[in-house]
Structure formats: structure tokens, C-alpha cells
């Protein structure tokens, strides 16, 4: 939203209540002048979509403007996205230079991401590299897997590792080597390890809050300006994951 005054367009950000302000502040995992890493909850969207719900980039702009008493525009560039029902670490750039460099790192595989997934069945092998060929159905907003190359399909690679088990579920660590649509959800479902709460890929029931039990746990990348290696760990929200800490 913007207002016009004396020929100048100035951004106007909403004012947060104290409870929301404190919640946002408490979920910032790292911040400096160049970037901000945020712990996203399930249900939040990273970037604006057709729902017209407020996205995190807009929320964080409002937060920074309010916290820093910033009269001008706040830059909050989206480096990568997480699906709406997924939680965990999301990186935002606070300058256009940082955004360009972080986008390049993401696209060239220099950004390493590890996820935690709570699944309904234990995998046959405790650790394995999975390679599938994925085809996206836009109308269904769903991804289908194949073990062999198909026309229009994209290769997807991830490595999972079994970490521990609870009475009913199993916790996997997933290292992502490619960033395809619904990749982890589709590939784990393909080996019979559907993610808890993920009805779209075969879970028997939803989670009470509409989430799926998939969390962006760890990100590692080179700082876009200082060039030092950054490692960020995002605490989980999922009760099953919390019980495994």
C-alpha cells in the first residue's frame, strides 16, 4: 500500500499488535544488514499467491518498518519458497545485491538444505539416495514420480537418513540435491513413507492444524557479502519432532 504526497510515493506498512510483533521477533533465526532467516510456521505463505492472504515478505517488511522506525521502503526479497503446509527456515534478502547473490547460490546448488520429515512407515533401508523423475500436474497441483526418464519429467535427487522412532511414527532427515515441486513429499510417498498429515500424497488423516510434518531444519550457505559460511538451524513446531529432540 502506498500514499501520494507532494508527488512522492511513500510506502505505508500496517502496525502490528504487541503479541504479533513479539511472535515475529522470536522467530527470526538470523539477521544482519544483508539478509534475514525466518522460522516459518505451517499455513504461512512466503510470497503472494492467488489467495491474496498476506505473505511473509509483506509481514516482515511491516515488522522491520515498525521495529526500526523506518520511514522509507523496506526491501525483503524472496530467495526461495516453502510449500504452505511446510514449516522451517526461509531466507530473505534485505538488499538487491544480496538477493542476486543468494538467488545465484540457490540456482547453482551452493545452498544446502536439510529437512526433517515425520513419516507413517519406516523405510526398508535406514539411509538411501533416491532418484526419481518427476512430472507436475498443474491442474491437480501434484507431482508424480517415475523410476525411469519420461518426456517432460525432471530428475530429482535426495538422500534420506532414519533418525529415530516414536510409538507410531518415524523421523527422517532429508538432504535435498534438487529443488522440484513437492519433491520430498512425492519421493517419500513413492517408497511407501508418506509424510504425516499429507493427504495429497496418501496420508490416512490430516494433522489437526492442516500442516504436514515436514520442516526445513537446517540451511548452509555462503554469506552474500562477507563470504563466510553460514549455518542456520530452525527449531521445529511439530510435537512429534519436538519429542525427538
Where do the protein language model's features map onto the residues?
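RNA pseudouridine synthases
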Residues: 1-245
